[in-house]
């Protein structure tokens, strides 16, 4: 994965975690959902969106299959940050 994009994803992850109150308000709108799963899903969704957007914005192309696999590894390597 391009190092610039990896750095942006780390910033996005830290920003999203710091927006915890907003995420909790969003989750509170739904009944009978597992908080941790929903919280993780929101964070992964934000990162996924940012991953594709930044590739198009910075590199002017879609990420390759290998870069997407590296993104998945990025998520796996940072899972402990997703826990609430």
State where each predicted segment sits:
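Cystatin/cathelin-like cysteine-protease inhibitor module
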Residues: 2-4, 32, 77-81
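Short terminal alpha-helical segments
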Residues: 1-27
């Amino acid at each position: 994965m391009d190092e610039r994009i990896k750095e942006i994803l780390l910033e996005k992850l830290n920003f999203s975690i710091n927006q915890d109150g907003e995420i909790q308000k969003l989750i509170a709108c739904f009944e009978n959902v597992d908080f941790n799963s929903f919280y993780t899903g929101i964070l992964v969704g934000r990162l996924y969106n940012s991953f594709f957007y930044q590739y198009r914005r910075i590199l002017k192309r879609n990420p390759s299959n290998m870069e997407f696999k590296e993104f998945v590894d990025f998520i796996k390597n940072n899972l402990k940050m997703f826990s609430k």
